[in-house]
Structures are given as C-alpha cells and as structure tokens.
Amino acid sequence: MSQGQERFLNYSQLLSELVDGRGRTLNDTTVAFLYQLFPNDLFVKAFSLLETHNLFLYVWDSIDDVALNDGVQCSDAEIDETSNSVAGSRLPTEGHQCHSKRNSNDNDISRLANMLYDLETRSKTLHRIIVQSVDEEVSKKPIYVDVTAWFCSCNEYTKCFSGMLHNNGDEGYQGMFETYGNETDDNFAKVNSHTHVNSSKVICQHLLAAAILLQTSLKVLKYFTSVKQSVSLFSINNKDDWLKLHLNIVD
C-alpha cells in the first residue's frame, strides 16, 4: 500500500469536464483526452455503456409518495413495446426491462440526482446500479455494480482481482490501495478520506461507467439521465421490491 504520497491527478474533477458548464453538451476536448488516459479502450467501453440504455440506477426513496408500480417509477407511455415494467420481482434481464426514455418526470429525476450528490444526503442514500448483460458477454445474468465499495460482479473484474492476489499474494493485496498524506477531494475509487483503490490495477468498464455517474459531478449525472436520457433512474420505496432487487442478483 503506497502511503504518504500526493494524488497526482484528480479523476473526479477531470471526468466532471465530460460535459460543458451548462450540462447540455459533451466537451469534445475532454472526451478525446479520456480516450487516451484509460488503457485498452476502457473509456470507450464505459462511455458506450452509458449510451446504450443498458444501465439502470435504483435509489431507495422511502418518502416518495408518488412512486408507481409498487415503488418503481416508469412512465407507461414511454416503455418500449418489447419491455415490461420492473415492478414486483422483475429486474432488467433480457426481454424484461424498463426502457423508459424519460424514466419518470423531469422533476423527479432531478430530485433523485440531487439526493445522490447533496453533501447532507449522499452518504445516507442507498442506491444500486444494475447493468443488463449484452449479447457479446458470456453470462446473461444482470451485472451488479457497487461503486462505493469498488466492486463489480462481472467476469472482467473477477479476473483482474484474482489475478493480482494469485500472482503477488499479500503484496498484490497491498498494491490494490493507495494512501495519501493529505485528504483529497477526488472521489474516484475512494475508500475513505485518505485511501483510494488503485484504479490502474482494479477496474472494469462497468465500474468506470458507474464512477462517471456517481463520483464526478451532478451535471454529469443529469446529462445522462435527463438530457441524453440514456441511463434509467428509478426510485424504490417498497422494502419487498428493494429486497427482490438483491435476491434476483444472487440468483
């Protein structure tokens, strides 16, 4: 574990520049730089994931009394004809997903996004990111991403993680983390105030996509959920549905 060093690059700040100051359009200069920053086309894959309507962000919202379909908000008029609501025990799986172009009304999307970035609520707000597997992937099961713990259930992450441990033992485990002498405001791969996961060694396209949404800035999250509407943002206020969300991932 590297200790006492200074963090050279603020990834959160850099990724926040993906969109312009108004949060309406992409910053082409920053996008071009990020293509080069991450290896093996990782940014290309993550960015594509954010644009393919295969990423679903669920927020636990127990005080939301306008939730539809047993806690999952989705406009019936805007669901693709080939898709079903995520109500009950349904999760985004092949043939059963909510491809809402607007998810819910704009005000609700904005409110949920604010909860995830407000300094007073973000640490208390439960959220889950589910990625629907695509045809090219070996497993058709939904992929679970926990960016706070820097964990992903995909094969790419598992191979990366196990490879470090098997090849380097305890040294490999220690090398997974970086500890800095001063507290940093870079939230990218952040474990606590002074420690980050070494994202150059432990990362996958799903984690990078999730970090772009949740560890950068509010304008970036709103760009993909409200402006481009390529990431679906839902609220859940029913405990049974919240538990089913996790049980389906285990299955």
UniProtKB/Swiss-Prot annotation:
<protein>
    <recommendedName>
        <fullName>Suppressor of hydroxyurea sensitivity protein 2</fullName>
    </recommendedName>
</protein>
<comment type="similarity">
    <text>Belongs to the SHU2 family.</text>
</comment>
<keyword id="KW-0234">DNA repair</keyword>
<feature type="region of interest" description="Disordered">
    <location>
        <begin position="83"/>
        <end position="105"/>
    </location>
</feature>
<dbReference type="GO" id="GO:0006310">
    <property type="term" value="P:DNA recombination"/>
</dbReference>
<keyword id="KW-0233">DNA recombination</keyword>
<keyword id="KW-0539">Nucleus</keyword>
<dbReference type="GO" id="GO:0005634">
    <property type="term" value="C:nucleus"/>
</dbReference>
<keyword id="KW-0227">DNA damage</keyword>
<dbReference type="GO" id="GO:0006281">
    <property type="term" value="P:DNA repair"/>
</dbReference>
<comment type="function">
    <text>Plays a role in a RAD51/RAD54-dependent homologous recombination repair (HRR) pathway to repair MMS-induced lesions during S-phase. Required for error-free repair of spontaneous and induced DNA lesions to protect the genome from mutation.</text>
</comment>
